[in-house]
């Protein structure tokens, strides 16, 4: 996933991906056969990002994942990779430097990065993104932006891929880390909110308002 889009970034003590640049690769080679060398934990880890794409208007992806969870149907990985890579490429072509629509790719990452940092990166990225999506979706329900049925379907899908939906990390720790997120500017932060099953939207809110998504 990170090979497509041209971002080159490093993690700092204050948070993830805070220092970087844009450099498009000459070639991206996707060889699904190499995934056979991965332990189950890393397969599950990758599914967090894949489920994210299902909420970015990728036609048919959620239905495919519902009927054939990747954990049990690994033979479908090539089709899934193709859909996700094409979706990201389409978004990046519209907004290479992330001044607009590309920020949608951060669904689940605001709270997810906070969880990673607060856990001292013991929680792997895909696991954190899954929890981050769930927390944001729960907040969206509280704010009247998402219906409960969509939230429950997301929860079922995440669990079907053996990913977590909750964390023992405190709200205060997550928010403290989120304030240093690269999408944070001054007193505001740009978040990605799921507004229906399969669709998400960008929203700029204050840090105080962000806290209400975790209440």
Each PLM stretch: what is its role?
Residues 63-172:
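Active-site segments that bind and position negatively charged phosphate/pyrophosphate groups
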Residues 35, 53-54, 121, 143, ...:
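Histidine kinase transmitter module recognition
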Residues 6, 23-26, 101, 187-188, ...:
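A generic structural signal for well-ordered coil/turn residues at beta-strand boundaries
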């Amino acid at each position: 996933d990170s090979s497509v889009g041209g971002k080159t970034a490093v993690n700092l003590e204050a948070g993830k991906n805070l220092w970087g640049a844009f450099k498009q690769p000459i070639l991206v080679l996707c060889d699904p056969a190499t995934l056979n060398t991965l332990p189950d934990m890393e397969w599950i880890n990758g599914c967090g990002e894949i489920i994210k794409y299902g909420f970015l208007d990728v036609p048919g992806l959620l239905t495919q994942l519902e009927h054939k969870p990747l954990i049990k149907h690994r033979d479908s990985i090539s089709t899934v990779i193709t859909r996700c890579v094409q979706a990201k490429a389409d978004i990046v072509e519209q907004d290479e430097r992330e001044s607009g629509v590309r920020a949608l790719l951060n669904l689940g990452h605001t709270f997810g990065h906070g969880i990673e940092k607060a856990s001292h990166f013991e929680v792997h990225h895909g696991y954190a993104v899954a929890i981050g999506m769930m927390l944001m979706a729960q907040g969206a329900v509280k704010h009247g932006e998402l219906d409960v049925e969509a939230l429950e379907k997301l929860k079922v899908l995440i669990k079907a891929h053996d990913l977590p939906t909750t964390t023992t990390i405190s709200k205060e720790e997550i928010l403290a880390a989120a304030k240093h997120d690269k999408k944070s500017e001054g007193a505001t932060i740009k978040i990605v909110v799921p507004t229906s099953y399969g669709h998400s939207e960008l929203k700029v809110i204050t840090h105080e308002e962000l806290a209400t998504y975790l209440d």
